[in-house]
Amino acid sequence: RALMRSGAKAGDGIYVTGTLGDAALALSHLLGKRTLNENQLAAVLPRLDHPHPRILAGQALRGLASSALDLSDGLASDLGHILKASGVRAQIDLDLLPLSPVLQDAVPARDAWQLALAGGDDYELCFTVPQEHHGALDTALANCGVRFTRIGRIQAGDPGIDYVQGEQPVELHLKGWDHFA
């Protein structure tokens, strides 16, 4: 059974594998926009140069996830494809974003959110799972050795993303990847 973008429903949890933003942090260093020390660069550069596609995790999600896709253009943009195809809205808790210690140490929180949400090149999976499959999800991805994090939930409403920190709304102006820039 194929994993589609169009199956997310209100009440589903939103999850991602791995950590987000490291590849974008490495690229921003290489482009001269940020300065990383040698250890920081050594930690994040492989995420840009040699990403590990989550093939086994994707296979394990069949029959559990209501929707899924890989994160190549950034979480906000790619999750937007699920929301549009499914006709639903998302709420993302910024405190739940899986950020590596290197990313958290290298930049302020808002910059880390920008890199994680709009940086791209993560090649992790974003997926939605109905409540009744949460227990099976733990087992399936543990068997693959893949770390995953619940970052929010699907809501009824027009496609779009509401960001919160705890319960407080947060307004973000994300600058996503532009293939034609």
Model-derived features with residue positions:
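Glycine-/charge-enriched secondary-structure boundary and capping motifs
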Residues: 63, 68-181
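Short loop segments at secondary-structure junctions
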Residues: 19-20, 33-35, 130-132
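Short, compositionally biased
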Residues: 25-42, 62
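Polyanion-binding loop/helix "lid" in catalytic or ligand-binding cores
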Residues: 39-81
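Phosphate-handling active-site elements
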Residues: 1-7, 37-38, 87-90
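Glycine-rich anion-binding loops of enzyme active sites
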Residues: 1-29, 153
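A generic local secondary-structure boundary/capping motif
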Residues: 1-7, 17, 49, 58, ...
